[in-house]
């Protein structure tokens, strides 16, 4: 009897392991195993996982690309690997966020135009300062270096009793006096030129007046004289009097007195 009972107990654990859902002790034994716990968790995550529709579309695109790759390899083209790489790069680039690049401002450089003629090193080497003068001669441009004296000092600084004093230099005073004299000479020259112009205008007016007077005298002579240089008789008697006025030149704008005292008279003509 003891042998039969022992054999029965030996069969019990095998049945429990094969049928874990039978009885309350089998339920505890099932959860005590780590493999069963992990499998249950994986099953739960697979059932509860949610897939976004955007990801589904991307998966569909990948499947289409894979199909085209397989078709290309079947046709015998060698560009299947290259196409797959390009497709993967395209998907990676599309997923990566685009960086906004700011437009770079165009920097414009201003070119400074130097004055003509350019500075010469040989001219700068001398002690006396020089200037360059340009002029045209026979249709050519001539550049000439001219010596220029150094500008005079206007102020002279001196230190006395811990103070700095500024005094006008003698050169500056002399230069100011020379400038004043030069200005006075210019004014005198302008005044003299104006006087000469006025005198010339007066002389021209006098000459015009003299010409007009001479024309009037000639007209009067033509009216009072008839014939070729004949003697005329006056009212006083049979005396022959030549009452023809004498013509004189006007010198220095002075009119002859005889012409002023002469009066028009009536004459009898004899034939």
From Swiss-Prot:
Residues 177-224 have a biased composition (Acidic residues). Expressed in the shoot apex, stamens, anthers and young siliques. Detected in provascular and vascular tissue. Signal peptide: none annotated. Pfam families: FAF. Residues 114-168 form the FAF domain. Residues 174-255 are annotated as: Disordered. Residues 237-247 have a biased composition (Basic residues). Belongs to the fantastic four family. Able to repress WUS when constitutively overexpressed, but have no effect on CLV3. This is Protein FANTASTIC FOUR 1. It comes from Arabidopsis thaliana (Mouse-ear cress). The lineage of its organism: Eukaryota, Viridiplantae, Streptophyta, Embryophyta, Tracheophyta.
């Amino acid at each position: 009897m003891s042998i039969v009972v022992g054999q029965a107990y030996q069969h019990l654990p095998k049945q429990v392991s094969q049928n874990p859902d039978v009885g309350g002790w089998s339920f505890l034994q099932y959860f005590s195993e780590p493999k069963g716990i992990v499998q249950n968790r994986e099953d739960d995550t697979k059932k509860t996982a949610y897939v976004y529709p955007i990801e589904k579309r991307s998966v569909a695109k990948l499947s289409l690309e894979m199909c085209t790759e397989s078709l290309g390899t079947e046709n015998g083209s060698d560009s299947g690997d290259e196409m797959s790489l390009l497709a993967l790069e395209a998907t990676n680039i599309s997923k990566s966020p685009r960086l906004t690049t700011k437009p770079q401002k165009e920097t414009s450089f201003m070119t400074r135009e130097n004055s003509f003629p350019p500075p010469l090193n040989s001219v700068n080497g001398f002690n006396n300062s020089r200037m360059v003068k340009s002029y045209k001669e026979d249709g050519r441009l001539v550049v000439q270096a001219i010596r220029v004296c150094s500008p005079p000092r206007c102020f002279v600084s001196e230190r006395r009793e811990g103070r700095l004093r500024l005094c006008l230099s003698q050169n500056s005073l002399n230069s100011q006096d020379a400038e004043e004299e030069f200005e006075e000479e210019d004014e005198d020259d302008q005044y003299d030129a104006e006087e000469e112009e006025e005198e010339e205008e007066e002389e021209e007016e006098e000459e015009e007046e003299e010409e007009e007077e001479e024309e009037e005298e000639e007209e009067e002579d033509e009216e009072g004289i008839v014939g070729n240089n004949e003697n005329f008789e006056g009212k006083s008697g049979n005396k022959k009097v030549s009452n023809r006025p004498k013509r004189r030149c006007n010198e220095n704008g002075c009119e002859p007195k005889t012409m002023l005292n002469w009066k028009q008279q009536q004459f009898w003509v004899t034939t």
